[in-house]
């Protein structure tokens, strides 16, 4: 379950930012996650709740913003929507796709005190 190490990394990032930006508590956290990031959202929620106990993010609301997956098709030279990494191009059926969006995991916004 790599979601645990991801949650731990998020808490570490929050602690670093708390020092740099002078806040003491995280009330809410918005994460952008793409469908190609290989992250189980419910597992991440569970792990986040577990690793934030006793930290500045304990009790913080975790909001997930799901990004769409997009790729550039080398077969028809079009930007297309995809749900999985190995989807075929919905326009021409080619599998020669380069992912351009959807494999992200990033902190979008924080609400802090």
Swiss-Prot record:
Binding site for Ni(2+): 2
UniProt keyword Disulfide bond present: no
Classification via InterPro entries: Hydgase_Ni_incorp_HypA/HybF_CS, HypA/HybF
Binding-site residues, Zn(2+): 73, 76, 89, 92
Pfam family for this entry, one: HypA
GO biological process, one term: protein maturation
Keywords assigned: Metal-binding, Nickel, Zinc
Any one GO MF annotation of this record: zinc ion binding
Domain of life: Bacteria
Family, similarity comment: Belongs to the HypA/HybF family.
Function: Involved in the maturation of [NiFe] hydrogenases. Required for nickel insertion into the metal center of the hydrogenase.
HAMAP family: HypA_HybF
Protein name: Hydrogenase maturation factor HypA
Lineage: Bacteria, Pseudomonadati, Pseudomonadota, Gammaproteobacteria, Pseudomonadales
């Amino acid at each position: 379950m790599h979601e645990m190490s991801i949650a731990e990394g998020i808490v570490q990032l929050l602690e670093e930012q708390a020092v740099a930006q002078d806040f003491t508590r995280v009330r809410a956290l918005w994460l952008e996650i793409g469908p190609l990031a290989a992250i189980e959202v419910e597992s991440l929620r569970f792990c986040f709740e577990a690793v934030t106990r006793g930290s500045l993010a304990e009790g913080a609301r975790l909001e997930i913003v799901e990004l769409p997956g997009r790729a550039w098709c080398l077969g028809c030279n079009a930007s297309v929507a995809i749900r999985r990494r190995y989807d075929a191009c919905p326009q021409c059926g080619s599998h020669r796709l380069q992912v351009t969006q959807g494999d992200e995991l990033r902190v979008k916004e924080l609400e802090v005190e």
